[in-house]
From Swiss-Prot:
It is an enzyme of class 5 (isomerase). Homodimer. This is tRNA pseudouridine synthase A. Gene3D superfamilies: Pseudouridine synthase I, catalytic domain, C-terminal subdomain, Pseudouridine synthase I, catalytic domain, N-terminal subdomain. Substrate binds at Y115. It holds the Pfam family PseudoU_synth_1.
């Protein structure tokens, strides 16, 4: 008798340093998704394909990534999560696992994602694994004026690394601001969806304005025109975290 399938929802945190992003890639490329699938397949002795709410880039971290997969295994989830965490690298941790409705999909059921970028004013031997650096004191007031421009529905083509897919380049941002937390300037942004490297390009542009190397009007024109200057490179991946996913 065939066993019925269950949909499992996981909450995952990871240090993205040393991984070629979230998404599985062919060959021997090490990714977060690939590591989790490898471990789950070993435990349950069946093929596993997981879907993540956010496809983080190489070097980007996650505090609360959400992923889902379907399985025919009857293994109790308490045993499964314990076994998985004992086999996963120390830089990946499944913090929760529960059965979800059959229709649940970690990516397509999500209503919004929140990212946070941590920025230091000066390099740090301790914190640089989880922060970018502006190499000086930025004008956070100017950066917050730019953050206000982002709220609403806009075409973020200028702040994306990829060509438009079938979903286009329109994103609806519901929150965006800089705030101080100890040594860090932190940028919090929430939207219904994000383009590839979008947050890192936005942060890079805001840092350029904050450090006086780019005018606020030039940033606004990038947003309006869909074009960015070739010299603008994405901010260091080390500072970016997928912070929360809402359903």
């Amino acid at each position: 008798m065939a066993r019925s399938k269950r949909t499992i929802k996981m909450q995952i945190e990871y240090d993205g340093t040393g991984y070629s992003g979230w998404q599985r890639q062919p060959g021997d490329v090490v990714t977060v998704q690939g590591e989790i699938e490898r471990v789950l397949e070993r435990i349950m002795q069946e093929p596993v394909s997981i879907d993540g709410a956010g496809r983080t880039d190489s070097g980007v971290h996650a505090r609360r990534q959400v992923a889902s997969f379907a399985t025919c295994s009857p293994m109790p989830l308490g045993r499964l999560i314990y076994s998985a965490n004992s086999l996963l690298p120390s830089t990946i941790r499944i913090n929760a696992m529960r059965q979800a409705p059959e229709s649940f999909h970690a990516r397509f059921s999500a209503t919004s994602r929140e990212y946070r970028y941590f920025l230091l004013e000066h390099p740090s031997a301790i914190d640089s694994r989880f922060a970018g650096c502006s190499h000086g004191k930025p004008d956070v007031g100017a950066m917050n004026r730019l953050a206000l421009m982002l709220i609403g529905t806009h075409d973020f083509a200028a702040f994306s690394k990829e060509t438009p897919d079938q979903y286009g380049t329109l994103c609806t941002v519901t929150a965006a601001r800089w705030y101080r937390s100890g040594r860090f300037h932190v940028f919090r942004i929430e939207a219904n969806r994000f383009l590839r490297s979008m947050v890192r390009f936005l942060v890079a542009g805001m840092i350029e304005v904050g450090m006086g190397r780019l005018e606020e009007g030039a940033f606004a024109r990038m947003l309006e025109s869909g074009h960015r200057p070739p010299k603008l490179k994405p901010a260091d991946a080390a500072g970016l975290f997928l912070w929360k996913v809402r359903y």
